[in-house]
Swiss-Prot record:
The active site is at residues 196, 325. GO terms for cellular component: cell surface; extracellular region; phosphopyruvate hydratase complex. Belongs to the enolase family. It comes from Natronomonas pharaonis (strain ATCC 35678 / DSM 2160 / CIP 103997 / JCM 8858 / NBRC 14720 / NCIMB 2260 / Gabara) (Halobacterium pharaonis). This is Enolase. Keywords: Cytoplasm, Glycolysis, Lyase, Magnesium, Metal-binding, Secreted. Disulfide bonds: none annotated. Pathway: Carbohydrate degradation; glycolysis; pyruvate from D-glyceraldehyde 3-phosphate: step 4/5. InterPro entries: Enolase (IPR000941), Enolase-like_C_sf (IPR036849), Enolase-like_N (IPR029017), Enolase_C (IPR020810), Enolase_CS (IPR020809), Enolase_N (IPR020811). The keyword Secreted applies. Mg(2+) binds at residues 232, 273, 300.
Amino acid sequence: MTLITEVRLRKILDSRGNPTVEAEVRTENGGFGRGAAPSGASTGEYEAVERPAEEAIAQARELAVPRIEGQVYAGDQRGVDNALHGADGTDDFSEIGANSAVAISMAAAKAAADVLGAPLYQHLGGAFRGRDFPVPLGNVIGGGEHAADATHIQEFLAAPVGAPSVADAVFANAKVHGEVQRQLDERGVPAAKGDEGAWAPSIDDSEAFEIMEEAIAAVEDEVGFEIRFGLDVAGAELYEDGVYHYGDETRSPDEQVAYIADLVEEYNLVYVEDPLDEDDFSGFAELTERVGDRTLICGDDLFVTNTERLQRGIDDGAANSILIKPNQIGTLSDAFDAIELATRNGYDPVVSHRSGETEDTTIAHLAVATDAPFIKTGAVGGERTAKLNELIRIEANA
C-alpha cells in the first residue's frame, strides 16, 4: 500500500534567502509527504556533506530516485534510507548531498504517516512513546557565527523548565525574547536580529549574562514558573592555534573548562552545548566530570549525530547529551540510530533546528516521538514558530 510511485525534487528558499532542497513523495494509494532540508552556519567538520541545491537535486534525480520509485515502500523507513545510502555510495552523502537525502527521507516518513492517517510523531515513535513533551530552548541573544559584532558565545537560550505545558513554555520564551529587547532599550543598546531570530546586540558576554538574568526574572514573576537558561558556546568557532579567542582575551583548553564550569555554577545553567572544540573529547570528559551532575553537556559539533563519534564520546565519558540534527547525518534512520545509542548509554538526545531553516515541522514530531527532554527551535520568526506551533498542536491533540 505504501509503495513509492513518485519522488519530486525542487529548489526552494531557506530563511537566510539561500536555495535548499525540497522533496515530495507519493505512494500508490495516494499517500503524500513533503520534506525540506535546513542548513547550518556553524557546521561541524565531520557533518555529512551538503551540496549546492541544484547539484544535489540533479545527483539525486539521477542516482537515488530510480532506486526508490516503484522499488521501496514509504512505510519501510529503513528501506528508504538504505536506498539513499546505496545510491550515494559514500559514507558522508558527498555524492547526492545530505540535503537531498534528508529531504527525501523526511518526505517518505510523512507519506507513510499520511497513509496510516496518523500524526508523524506516532508513526515515528509508535504507540509506546512516553507522556512527556520536550521543553523548547529559545534563542534570545545571539552572536558567534549567527551574527557579526555581537557576543562571542553563540546562543543564550531561555529554558522554561517549570512550564506546565508546551504552550506555556513557548509563550514564556517569546516573553523572554521581548523582555530582552526591553532591557536592551533601557540600556540604549540597539540590536538587530541574527539568523535564528535572537537579538544580536554589540555587547560583551558578561553584559549578555546580566540581561538574561534580569529578563528571565521579570518573566518568571509574570508567568509564575521556573525559567532557567543555557548556552551554545560553539567552541569550535572560538578555537584557533590551541587557544579559545574571546576578542583580545584568550583561554587555554584547561582555562576554558574552568571558565565553563564557573558559568554553570554562577548562573545555574541547565544546558551547555559545544563548550569546547569539536575534537577535544578529553576536555568534554573533564567538564562532564566536574558539572555533568548539574547540567546537560551537549555535543553538537563533537558528535554531529554520528554513532561512531558518539561511541567514542561514550567510551571517554565525554558529554552527557547529544544534539540531533537529521541533516548532519543525512537520514531519519541514521538520526534514530544515534538517539538509540545515546539513550541506551544515558545520554539525553536534544533535537535541533539549523540556522538556515524552512517551514518544515519534522523535528517537532521527532522530538516528541523520541521523548527528547529539549528541542532547540528558536523563539520567534516564521520558520521557528512553524515548529513551535506544531508542538502546541501535537500536545493539544495527543
